[in-house]
Swiss-Prot record:
Subcellular location: Plastid, Chloroplast thylakoid membrane
Keywords: Chloroplast, Membrane, Photosynthesis, Plastid, Thylakoid, Transmembrane, Transmembrane helix
Residues passing through the membrane, by range: 21-41, 63-83
Name of the protein described by the UniProt record: Photosystem I assembly protein Ycf4
A Pfam family that the UniProt record links to this protein: Ycf4
Sequence similarity: Belongs to the Ycf4 family.
Organism of origin: Gracilaria tenuistipitata var. liui
Role played: Seems to be required for the assembly of the photosystem I complex.
Length: 184
């Protein structure tokens, strides 16, 4: 977080997280293994060392292994492309000098690759905190405009602690001079 007296900037980490690297690698290795086992059962040539995949019948085991391997390789390709393109990264800039809030994110390649939202500070109604506990906890901060749009300000990934999210939301609300919603 970069803060001056009148300007506050939050960097947002995109898809280049350690967990994404881990899962993209694991899925790629698993997919390649399944694909090579299926191909070995068809060609009757051992393509994967330390296995006896030539003993498998191509129909139905080998073809299913090839299908699952291909699906996993495609999913892994998608994950690697989101990492390379750094989808979701960007920054939130709150500038009281010129009265603007800028939300900048990188998207998928194409005409809408760069997502840049600008709002005047006087058009902002509140800072909203949404906390949902359970199996998949959700702790997010939203910028709520006067026309009731809610723009997420927090990054995807590990949820922040309750103390962190309350502190950050309270600071933003005070910095922008708006009310804080969702904290009881």
């Amino acid at each position: 977080m970069y803060t001056m007296a009148q300007i506050k900037t939050d960097k947002i980490l995109g898809s280049r997280r350690i967990s994404n690297y881990f899962w993209a690698t694991i899925i790629l290795l698993g997919g390649l293994s399944f694909f090579l086992v299926g191909l070995s059962s068809y060609l009757k040539i051992e393509l994967l060392p330390f296995t006896k995949s030539t003993d498998l019948l191509f129909l139905p085991q080998g073809i299913i292994m090839t299908f699952y391997g291909t699906a996993a390789i495609l999913i892994s390709l998608f994950l690697w492309l989101t990492i390379i393109w750094n989808i979701g990264s960007g920054y939130n800039e709150f500038n009281r000098d010129i009265g603007l809030v800028t939300i900048y994110r990188l998207g998928f390649p194409g005409k809408n690759r760069l997502i840049k939202l600008r709002y005047k500070i006087h058009d902002i109604y509140s800072i909203k905190v949404q906390i949902q506990e359970g199996l998949t906890p959700k702790r997010e901060i939203y910028l709520k405009t006067k026309d009731k749009r809610e723009i997420p300000l927090t990054q995807v990934g590990q949820p922040m602690s309750l103390a962190q999210i309350e502190e950050r939301a309270a600071f933003l609300a005070k910095f922008l001079g708006v009310i804080l919603e969702g904290i009881r």
